[in-house]
């Protein structure tokens, strides 16, 4: 589909806006995946606060200039599907990883978090906020009150030593 200049500018602005509000991004190759499967992926992504779009490589590179995801520019080779997570850093990677397990033709290219290229598998295993709080609470429950007090005291002493 041929796009006029205004259409291209609108796509660049849309992708740039999504990138500026995102915590992480994932780029994938969806060649060979059926339209029905991609539609289901889009539906799941929307439900999890993930923005995704198939974008031309040159437009994607231009849209990501000056954002924390500029490091992804080298991954835009061939058909590219880009997704931005705005609610949880691991959401897009988790959704794409699960989808790739079901669809062998779907291939994760790369992921970015806080301006750095990271392994998508690592990003997908990040705990959600609720999981992290649950882990912290269980760790605090397991530790006896004395151990917790000693740990807090040790941290206080260490910070005082660093300040001096």
UniProtKB/Swiss-Prot annotation:
The keyword Translocase does not apply. Part of the ribosomal stalk of the 50S ribosomal subunit. The N-terminus interacts with L11 and the large rRNA to form the base of the stalk. The C-terminus forms an elongated spine to which L12 dimers bind in a sequential fashion forming a multimeric L10(L12)X complex. It comes from Pseudoalteromonas translucida (strain TAC 125). InterPro entries: Ribosomal_uL10, Ribosomal_uL10-like_sf, Ribosomal_uL10_bac, Ribosomal_uL10_bac_type, Ribosomal_uL10_CS_bac. HAMAP family: Ribosomal_uL10. SUPFAM superfamilies: Ribosomal protein L10-like (SSF160369). Keywords: Ribonucleoprotein, Ribosomal protein, RNA-binding, rRNA-binding. PROSITE patterns: RIBOSOMAL_L10. Forms part of the ribosomal stalk, playing a central role in the interaction of the ribosome with GTP-bound translation factors. Belongs to the universal ribosomal protein uL10 family. It holds the Pfam family Ribosomal_L10. The keyword Kinase does not apply. This is Large ribosomal subunit protein uL10. NCBIfam families: PRK00099.1-1. Transmembrane segments: none annotated. GO terms for biological process: translation. GO terms for cellular component: large ribosomal subunit. GO terms for molecular function: large ribosomal subunit rRNA binding; structural constituent of ribosome.
């Amino acid at each position: 589909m041929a796009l006029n200049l205004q259409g291209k500018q609108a796509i660049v602005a849309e992708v740039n806006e999504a990138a500026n509000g995102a915590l992480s991004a994932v780029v994938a190759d969806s060649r060979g995946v059926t339209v029905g499967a991609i539609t289901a992926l889009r539906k799941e992504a929307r439900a999890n606060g993930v923005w995704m779009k198939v974008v031309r490589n040159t437009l994607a590179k231009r849209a990501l200039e000056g954002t924390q995801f500029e490091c992804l520019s080298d991954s835009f080779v061939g058909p590219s599907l880009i997704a931005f997570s705005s609610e949880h850093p691991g959401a897009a990677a988790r959704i794409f990883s699960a989808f790739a397990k079901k669809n062998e033709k779907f291939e994760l290219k790369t992921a970015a978090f806080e301006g750095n290229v990271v392994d998508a598998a690592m990003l997908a295993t990040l705990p959600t906020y609720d999981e992290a709080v649950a882990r912290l609470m269980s760790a605090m429950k397991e530790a006896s009150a004395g151990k917790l007090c000693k740990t807090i005291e040790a941290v206080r002493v260490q910070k005082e030593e660093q300040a001096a």
